[in-house]
């Protein structure tokens, strides 16, 4: 595959300029066949690397466009191969004409993620760094951007390298003892090995445990909007998303299925989940929707219990019997909606009665989703309730489920090593578990990953990356 020279459009359609990437052993030669520098003299192949050359793309005698060509020589390029980048005007016609000329002269169309895959195969980055490229492209908040950038720059890779070096040192001491078992030579006492195992276990556990935070940062804090029918859940969702995502109607039971979408508030990505209203119903479809409501409630980090302020007292039993027990370890906010329908005295009475019945520690807020009253304050409450740590580019937080699974397997293996040391088992059994731990950590970096897994990972990239 790496013997082919590939090309692809690297920019989105509709922009003022467009960019085409060419990479492979014939990248400079093929680009030079269709490109003529504006200044006569040097051919493209004679230009210095890391330079921009102004000129024109020709199809025979016909000029296609005036362009800039960037030149990179192996191994000092993104892919580690000879590469060019052609920057032209953003017309889709021009871009397609240039692509056709490149393919006609020996290029083939790149597969999704093939540029980054080549960078990985050519040793420009490990697999975790390659995956971070996709995360950086998809980042939608300051936190996801910082985490992806940290991983792409090798923060996670350095942690893995240090762990593998310690484990290799560990297993070498064990296996040396096995080699000299007949001579009764001890290269490291068991207490020293146990301390080393504890040190390794602590780092792996920290990385694995960081996934609970990393996953929320990457995919959004799940917020379930729950309540009885016609409490204003769909109206609130539309306000929070600033678009008409959900159908709003006075008819009870309008929302029958779960509606989800994400939005960035205060630098944090929230995943809002609008659910079917809870009520007694004989409608089979609506009942299934209510079932899903409780499923989503269980999966949420934050629960907004929507209450129609004009009919709030009737919900106390449902709230205390069915909702509170499910929210013991969640952030629950009571959202009294339609506040325009009650006066200040009624508002104070409601707050007092709910506080007396369910406890004053439950947070509450009065809003009008329809009139957008106090919805800004609700957003501020959501940011505070998220409890996400401040993320810097130096933080190593796991956001990828593949990495998390490998870390948990590595953690299981090092736990067996600790148990084996305590039980004073034979060194050959310890060595097997240490090597298994190394295997799972190496899998994250792509050192032992099979071709099918690689193909699946890079297939999720865009064509030009």
Swiss-Prot record:
It is found in: Cytoplasm. GTP binds at residues 230-235, 249-255, 274-277. InterPro entries: G_TrmE, GTP-bd, GTP-bd_TrmE_N, GTPase_MnmE, MnmE_dom2, MnmE_helical, P-loop_NTPase, Small_GTP-bd. Residues 220-387 form the TrmE-type G domain. Its cofactor is K(+). K(+) binds at residues 230, 249, 251, 254. Binds 1 potassium ion per subunit. It is an enzyme of class 3 (hydrolase). SUPFAM superfamilies: P-loop containing nucleoside triphosphate hydrolases. (6S)-5-formyl-5,6,7,8-tetrahydrofolate binds at residues 21, 85, 124, 465. It comes from the Bacteria. One of its GO terms (cellular component) is cytosol. Exhibits a very high intrinsic GTPase hydrolysis rate. Involved in the addition of a carboxymethylaminomethyl (cmnm) group at the wobble position (U34) of certain tRNAs, forming tRNA-cmnm(5)s(2)U34. NCBIfam families: mnmE_trmE_thdF, small_GTP. This is tRNA modification GTPase MnmE. The lineage of its organism: Bacteria, Pseudomonadati, Bacteroidota, Bacteroidia, Bacteroidales. The gene is mnmE.
């Amino acid at each position: 595959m790496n013997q082919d020279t590939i090309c692809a459009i690297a920019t989105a359609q509709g922009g003022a300029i467009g960019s085409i990437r060419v990479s492979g052993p014939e990248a400079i030669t093929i680009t030079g066949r269709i490109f003529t520098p504006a200044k006569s003299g040097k051919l493209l192949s004679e230009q210095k690397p890391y330079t921009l050359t102004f000129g024109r793309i020709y199809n025979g005698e016909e000029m296609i466009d005036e362009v800039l060509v960037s030149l990179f020589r192996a191994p000092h390029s993104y892919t580690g191969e000879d590469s060019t980048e052609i920057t032209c005007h953003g017309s889709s016609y021009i871009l397609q004409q240039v692509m056709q000329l490149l393919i006609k002269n020996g290029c083939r169309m790149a597969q999704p993620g093939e540029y980054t895959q080549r960078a990985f195969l050519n040793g420009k980055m490990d697999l975790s760094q390659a995956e971070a490229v996709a995360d950086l492209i998809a980042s939608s908040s300051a936190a996801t951007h910082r985490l992806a950038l940290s991983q792409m720059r090798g923060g996670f890779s350095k942690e893995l390298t240090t762990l593998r070096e310690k484990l290799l040192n560990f297993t070498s001491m064990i296996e040396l003892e096995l080699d000299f078992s007949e001579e009764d030579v001890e290269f490291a006492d068991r207490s020293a090995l146990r301390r080393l195992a504890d040190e390794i276990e602590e780092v792996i556990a920290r990385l694995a445990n960081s996934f609970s935070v990393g996953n929320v940062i990457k995919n959004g804090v799940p917020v379930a909007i729950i309540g009885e029918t016609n409490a204003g859940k769909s109206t609130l969702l539309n306000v929070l998303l600033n678009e008409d995502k959900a159908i709003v109607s006075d008819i009870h039971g309008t929302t029958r299925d779960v509606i989800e979408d994400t939005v960035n508030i205060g630098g944090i990505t929230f995943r809002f989940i609008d659910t079917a209203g809870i009520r007694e119903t004989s409608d089979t479809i609506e009942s299934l929707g209510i079932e899903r409501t409780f499923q989503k409630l269980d999966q949420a980090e934050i629960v907004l219990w929507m209450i129609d302020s004009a009919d709030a007292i009737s919900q106390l039993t449902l709230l205390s019997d069915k909702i509170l027990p499910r929210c013991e370890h969640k952030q629950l906010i009571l959202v009294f909606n339609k506040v325009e329908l009650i006066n200040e005295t009624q508002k104070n009475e409601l707050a007092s009665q709910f506080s007396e019945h369910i406890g004053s520690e439950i947070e509450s807020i009065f809003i009008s989703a329809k009139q957008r009253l106090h919805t800004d304050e609700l957003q501020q409450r959501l940011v505070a309730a998220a409890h996400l740590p401040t993320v810097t580019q130096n933080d190593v937080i796991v956001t990828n489920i593949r990495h998390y699974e490998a870390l948990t397997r590595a953690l299981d293996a090092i736990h067996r090593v600790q148990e084996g040391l305590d039980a004073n088992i034979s060194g050959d059994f310890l060595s097997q578990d240490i090597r298994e731990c190394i295997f799972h950590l190496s899998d994250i970096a792509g050192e032992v990953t099979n071709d099918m897994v690689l193909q699946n990972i890079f297939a999720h990239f865009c064509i030009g990356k």
